[in-house]
Amino acid sequence: MRVLVKPAQSPDGFQSIALCWSEGRTQKDRAIRQKHEDRFLADSEKLAKRIALGRLRTSAKIYETIGRLKERYPRVARYYQLAYDEQQGQLSCLEDLQRKQKAESLDGSYLLKSSRKNLDAEDIWRTYILLSRVEAVFRA
């Protein structure tokens, strides 16, 4: 597993910051987003079928259901525009590819902050990994 660590500047100057990127974290982030996206799209298709079959008729209920759907999948709902056309009685789902690609480019990236200014980026990362392993031992 490859990990890249770069130092970054704190805006206030009172913290040490490390910008990290990990291949493993990238794969994990993509898998999580894909799972949520599949579920979101499946649920939006179910909603469209309910509307088409006449099970949901009032606009208020339809918009409420759209809101619940967006609330249930906030990680991926921001990349889609769900719109209900009242005259045709259809639900449309449009994907915002630019926004999605921008988020995908950040997969695997994370910031580590420390109040200890004497630590460089590598030391911050090593301390983070050590603490993560200690936490895992206590959880086991």
Question: Where do the language-model regions lie?
Answer:
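Anion-binding and metal-coordination hotspots
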Residues: 1-140
